[in-house]
C-alpha cells in the first residue's frame, strides 16, 4: 500500500472513530451530522465525500465493524475455552468485556436493530445472523446435535445475551456482575434444556407412539 493510500485509510479510520466517539446513552447515530463528524476527525466537511458517499454509508460501515469486532472476540473466547474452562462463563465474561470496552459499538447495534432505516435494520440483522451461525457451528461440533437443534439453541442464547447487554450498558460494576451471573444461569438452563429436548426426540424413535406426552 502506497503512502497516499495509507493516508486515505488513516483518514477513513479517523472518521469512523470520530462517529463512534460521539455516540452515547443520550445520542444516537441519527442525530450525528456530517460536519460534526468531520470536525472531530480533523478534516474539512467536503473531504468527507472522498471516503464515504454519505453519512448512511459511514453508519453501515460502523455496523459491520461492530459486528465483526464482537464475533472476533467470541472466536478468541472459544480458543481460550479449548485450553480449559467453562464454555458459558468464559463466553459471558468476554461479551461483558466487549460491552465495557466498546459501549458505543453495542449501542449502535441495539438501536439500529429496530431503527427507522431499512438498510440499517438489514445490516444489523445480517450481523446477528452471522453471530448465530458461528455459535450454531460451534454447538454442532461440540455437542454432536443436528443443525436444527443447534440453530434454535444459538438463536435463543443470542437473544438473551443481547437483552442482557442492553441492561449492562449503563449500570455500575456490582450490577453488571449480577447481570453476568444471571446470564450464565440462563444460558446454562437453555443448554441443559436443548440437550434434554434432543435426547427426548431421540428416545421417541424407540418408544411406542402415544406413550410420551408432548410438552
Curated annotation (Swiss-Prot):
Main location: cytoplasm
Subcellular location: Cytoplasm
Keyword match Transferase: no
A biological process from GO: fatty acid biosynthetic process
Alphabetical keyword list: Cytoplasm, DNA-binding, Fatty acid biosynthesis, Fatty acid metabolism, Lipid biosynthesis, Lipid metabolism, Repressor, Transcription, Transcription regulation
One CC-aspect GO term: cytoplasm
DNA-binding span(s): 33-52
Keyword GTP-binding: no
InterPro entries named among the record's database cross-references: DesT_TetR_C, Homeodomain-like_sf, HTH_TetR, HTH_transcr_repressor_FabR, Tscrpt_reg_HTH_FabR
HTH tetR-type domain residues: 10-70
GO molecular function annotations of the record: DNA binding; DNA-binding transcription factor activity
Pfam families per UniProt: TetR_C_46 (PF21943), TetR_N (PF00440)
Cited function: Represses the transcription of fabB, involved in unsaturated fatty acid (UFA) biosynthesis. By controlling UFA production, FabR directly influences the physical properties of the membrane bilayer.
Record text on subunit structure and interactions: Homodimer.
Protein name as annotated: HTH-type transcriptional repressor FabR
